[in-house]
Design a protein with these regions (language model features):
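Rossmann-fold cofactor-recognition segment
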Residues: 51-68
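Conserved glycine-rich Rossmann-like NAD(P)H-binding loop of the short-chain dehydrogenase/reductase
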Residues: 30-46
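Catalytic loop of short-chain dehydrogenase/reductase
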Residues: 89, 99-109, 113, 117-119, ...
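Conserved glycine-rich cofactor-binding loop
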Residues: 16-18
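Catalytic Tyr-x(3-8)-Lys segment
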Residues: 195-216
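C-terminal substrate-recognition "lid" of short-chain dehydrogenase/reductases
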Residues: 210-237, 242
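Conserved Rossmann-fold SDR core element
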Residues: 159, 168-184, 230-237
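Substrate-binding pocket helix/loop in short-chain dehydrogenase/reductase
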Residues: 94-97, 101-106, 198, 202
């Protein structure tokens, strides 16, 4: 299936770290033309170095919560076959309701719901009929925990967006991958120095006995990019988390 993507032009929003970086690496190995989009110039430059062995992605520094910047991104990017978005800013969003700040909630909603809508609004019209948009939701929509109200709501909302866009933007395909607990830098933001013990505890609770990796999620995203008969779908890659 990977051969179907050779030469395809793919924008990866959030492709400079975590799951997005793993996606970028897999796509470069499949000889795709990859444009990595992110807010941080330092992270973009670091991603280029990390990916050097696989190819040379293009880089574009953009705040995807800004409609003007998203519009300019697609005006300057040239043709695009597929769009992937793994970006999320959930700093401060994992809190009990009395401590949840409106700023953190607004930031998380804008990064994970508003941004994908803006990307589709300005990107879909420039994409061919065989193209696709793949977003990332998350296990919190299905197995919420204390402090998870904001993230559960946001992931559930995003999956509604996916289904609606799959209808409205057809024949363009729109899907989501719903990761479970995955070892990415985001856990440093959530748990700080406690991130490793937390991940170890999570692994013990899962049927597969481990937390996920960026490549686990990248495999699923690449599948959705290449499968032309899948749309409006949420693909769960969660180590069996929904079963326990």
């Amino acid at each position: 299936m990977g051969n179907r993507l050779v030469g395809q032009r793919i924008v990866v929003v959030g492709g400079s770290s975590g799951m997005g970086l793993a996606v970028s690496a897999q796509l470069l190995r499949r000889h795709c033309e990859v444009l990595i989009v992110g807010r941080s110039r330092d992270k973009l430059d670091a991603a280029r170095e990390a990916l050097r062995a696989f190819g040379a992605p293009r880089l574009h520094q953009v705040d995807v919560t800004s409609e003007a910047q998203v519009q300019r991104l697609f005006e300057e990017s040239g043709p695009v076959d597929h769009l992937v978005c793994t970006a999320a800013d959930i700093r401060g969003a994992y809190e009990l309701l009395p401590q949840l700040s409106l700023d953190a909630l607004d930031r998380a909603i804008r990064s994970k719901v508003v941004a994908p809508i803006l990307l589709a609004k300005h990107g879909a019209q420039r994409m061919p009929a065989h193209g696709s948009i793949t977003l990332t939701s998350g296990i919190a929509a299905y197995r919420p925990r204390p402090k998870g109200v904001a993230v559960a709501a946001i992931n559930a909302a995003l999956e509604g967006v996916v289904r609606a866009m799959a209808v409205e933007l057809a024949p363009l395909r729109v899907n989501a991958v719903s990761p479970g607990w995955v070892r990415t830098p985001i856990w440093k933001d959530v748990a700080g120095a406690d991130s490793e013990p937390l991940l170890a505890s999570m692994a013990e609770q899962l049927p597969v006995g481990r937390v996920g990796t960026g490549d686990d999620i990248a495999d699923a995203i690449v599948f959705l990019l290449g499968n032309g008969y899948t749309t409006g779908t949420v693909l769960h890659v969660d180590g069996g988390h929904r079963l326990v």
